[in-house]
Design a protein with these regions (language model features):
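C-terminal active-site subregion of NodB/CE4 polysaccharide deacetylases
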Residues: 107-181, 186-190, 242-349
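N-terminal secretory signal peptides that target proteins for export/translocation
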Residues: 1-17
Length: 349
């Protein structure tokens, strides 16, 4: 493949690929007709299901009404990779006879192109109810409309592990990626949000402060967290007591303050690890407050990702221990949609 072709954005490369498919198909048909006129010669016909293959991509002719998920399972190792095929074939209808481009290599992991770069918005919720009386509470019907919008408009609710791989330049993520997070550990996350998320095929990351878990009828339980984890949800730390990590309490000495924030950060990880049998790698700063000292302790405790509530998205070059999140407090759809910015336009030519 020519270097100039490889340097093009994926959509341009795939457009060029589709332009040559006609000629490839003519070659396949012509070869078959030619050899059919020479019956005395033993011939191995080209595969009827694969028009072209290189180390970079496959051009595949659909034999039936195969889906992108079925092709992803066959060529890319799992149905969850179907978005790669969908993004490589914009506007193509998956039906018998269609030629589909299947990228085999993970290119452009940073989400860069000449017009700008990819950003990943992180959406933050707290509790849910049928009727709400607080900005931190999201009505169930409104939350369902929001998830319905994400699904209908091609957004992918990625996992925290996918976000980490993107930030570490290990893995590409879908162009329209969002991470859904829920803070504190309210039971309504399990009773209301969880069924809605499953309905649309989404997962989320829960940040719990461990002293709250199971402490009242409003709190989620460890058994419920175990169930959600088995369903693909990620459980992260939000400290033990949800105290401000950036300032001393009244009457607290510097030594006492340092011991307290270390316990909040280290201790919560230890509790979650023991309760859920995992290595907790993601943390949300209580109230979204952080400073250089808390970042350093979070790093030393073994966390790979830590999140604030500073508004905005996260590019591949973002500090993984100071990521931005948008709290979804208003209930109207225009405001929600405005938080879904997945691309930052900036001329990189």
């Amino acid at each position: 493949m020519y270097p100039g072709f490889i340097s093009l954005p994926l959509t341009d490369r795939c457009s060029n690929i589709h332009k040559i498919l006609f000629f490839i198909m003519l070659f396949v048909i012509g070869s078959t007709v030619f050899w059919s006129c020479a019956p005395t010669r033993a011939v191995t016909e080209p595969s009827a299901e694969r028009l072209f293959r290189s180390k970079d991509y496959v051009v595949y002719q659909l034999q039936d009404n195969e889906t992108s998920a079925e092709l992803a399972e066959r060529f890319l190792g799992g149905k969850s990779q179907s978005w790669i095929i969908e993004e490589a074939n914009p506007g193509i209808i998956f039906k018998r006879g269609a030629a589909i481009v299947i990228p085999l290599k993970d290119r452009n992991r940073a989400g860069l192109n000449p017009e700008g770069f990819q950003t990943i918005p992180v959406l933050t919720y707290h509790r849910f109810a049928e009727n709400c009386d607080s900005p931190l509470c999201m009505p169930a019907a409104t939350f369902e409309l929001q998830m319905q919008y994400l699904k209908k408009n091609g957004y992918h609710a990625i996992t925290a592990e996918q976000l980490l791989a993107f930030l570490e330049y290990r893995q590409r993520v879908p162009e329209k990626s969002v991470l859904i997070t829920m803070d504190d550990g309210y039971r309504s996350v399990y009773e209301i949000a969880y069924p809605i998320l499953k309905k649309y095929g989404f997962t989320a990351t829960l940040f719990i402060y461990t002293s709250f878990v199971g402490a009242s009828g409003m709190a989620i339980t460890w058994e419920q967290l175990k169930e959600m984890k088995k369903s693909g949800f990620t459980i992260g730390s939000h400290s033990i007591y949800h105290s401000d990590l950036t300032r001393l309490k009244v009457g607290e000495t510097e030594q006492q303050y340092l011991a307290r924030i270390k316990e909040e950060i280290y201790g919560s990880k230890k509790i979650i690890d023991q309760k859920l049998g995992q290595n907790t790698y993601i943390f949300a700063y209580p109230f979204g407050y952080y400073d250089q000292r808390s970042i350093q302790i979070v790093r030393e405790a073994g966390y790979k990702i830590a999140m604030s509530v500073k508004r905005g998205g996260n590019a591949f070059f973002a500090n993984p221990l100071a990521l931005r999140r948008d709290q979804i407090l208003k209930k109207d759809m225009p405001t929600f949609i405005s938080r879904l910015k997945t691309f930052n336009p900036l001329s990189l030519k």
